[in-house]
């Protein structure tokens, strides 16, 4: 798992209170990890702070899985 993926996993575990082994690449934040819309907003804010990236609202809709988040951040981080 990449450094980005490990850091995202840590954030997801902390914010959603899920077991680390549930946070796998293809896990859906909504369906598999039990996040609701408020959780998604909080996760995005945490990702932005952790990685120094801005994630616009139209991009948030495209980040549905852990893998989506890793890909987006890897493409946009400084």
UniProtKB/Swiss-Prot annotation:
Of the GO CC terms on this record, one is: membrane
Q: Where is the Carrier domain?
A: 2-77
Q: Does the keyword Ubl conjugation apply?
A: no
Q: Which InterPro entries match?
A: ACP, ACP-like_sf, PP-bd_ACP, Ppantetheine_attach_site
Annotated pathway: Lipid metabolism; fatty acid biosynthesis
Keywords for the protein's UniProt record, in alphabetical order: Cytoplasm, Fatty acid biosynthesis, Fatty acid metabolism, Lipid biosynthesis, Lipid metabolism, Phosphopantetheine, Phosphoprotein
Modified sites of kind O-(pantetheine 4'-phosphoryl)serine: 37
Could you tell me the Gene Ontology terms of the biological process aspect for this record?
A: lipid A biosynthetic process
Residue span of the signal peptide, if any? none
Instruction: Using the record for this protein, list the coiled-coil segments as residue ranges, or answer none.
Output: none
- Mainly resides where? cytoplasm
Entry PTM: 4'-phosphopantetheine is transferred from CoA to a specific serine of apo-ACP by AcpS. This modification is essential for activity because fatty acids are bound in thioester linkage to the sulfhydryl of the prosthetic group.
Q: What family is this?
A: Belongs to the acyl carrier protein (ACP) family.
Q: What does this protein do?
A: Carrier of the growing fatty acid chain in fatty acid biosynthesis.
Quote the protein name from its UniProt record.
Acyl carrier protein
UniProt source species: Zymomonas mobilis subsp. mobilis (strain ATCC 31821 / ZM4 / CP4)
What's the name of its gene?
acpP
């Amino acid at each position: 798992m990449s450094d980005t993926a490990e850091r995202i996993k840590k954030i997801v575990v902390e914010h959603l209170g899920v077991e680390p082994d549930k946070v796998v690449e293809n896990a859906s934040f909504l369906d598999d990890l039990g996040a609701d819309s408020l959780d998604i907003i909080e996760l995005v804010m945490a990702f932005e702070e952790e990685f120094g990236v801005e994630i616009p609202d139209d991009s948030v809709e495209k980040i549905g899985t852990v893998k989506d988040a890793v890909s987006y951040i890897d493409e946009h981080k400084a």
